[in-house]
Amino acid sequence: MNFSVIFAVGIGGFFGAISRFLIATWMQKITHSLFPVGTLTVNVLGSFIIGFLYMYFEQSINPIYKAMFITGFLGALTTFSTFSLETLLMIQDGLWIRAFLNILLNVILTISSTFAAIILFKKMYGGL
């Protein structure tokens, strides 16, 4: 493994984690919601960005940038573990509908967001 790639992943992860904290906290604060809208926001945003970057990086770009942005930044920005914990806590509190809605929204919106980004990229820059 190349040290430059490892370093790039670390740098991307640093900024992704900070971004996740700031975005999720801000979204939760402005919505005043009991629903974990902050986690949903970073997951949907990250899914959109990964769809766009997937298409961009297919156009042959330095693999260090791909590792930094996809593995590092987006790996730290999105958060399946927080989504899992929040859903489990809802279930434990008997909030079954909210838990189901959380699962449904995270799955449908993240996949749709990635798909939308790929379509947008193709419209903007042409397909592969």
UniProtKB/Swiss-Prot annotation:
Q: What are the entry keywords?
A: Cell inner membrane, Cell membrane, Ion channel, Ion transport, Membrane, Metal-binding, Sodium, Transmembrane, Transmembrane helix, Transport
What regulates this protein's activity?
Na(+) is not transported, but it plays an essential structural role and its presence is essential for fluoride channel function.
Note the topology in the membrane.
Answer: Multi-pass membrane protein
Its UniProt entry gives the catalysed reaction(s) as: fluoride(in) = fluoride(out)
Question: Superkingdom of the source?
Answer: Bacteria
Q: Which residues bind Na(+)?
A: G75, T78
Q: Where in or outside the cell is it found?
A: Cell inner membrane
Q: What is a single molecular function from GO for this protein?
A: metal ion binding
Primary location class? membrane
Gene Ontology process terms (BP)? cellular detoxification of fluoride
* Recorded GO CC terms: plasma membrane
Membrane-spanning regions, if any?
A: 3-23, 34-54, 69-89, 100-120
Q: Does the keyword DNA-binding apply?
A: no
- Relate the protein's function as given in its record: Fluoride-specific ion channel. Important for reducing fluoride concentration in the cell, thus reducing its toxicity.
Q: Which family does it belong to?
A: Belongs to the fluoride channel Fluc/FEX (TC 1.A.43) family.
What is this protein called in UniProt? Fluoride-specific ion channel FluC
What is the scientific name of the source organism? Nitratiruptor sp. (strain SB155-2)
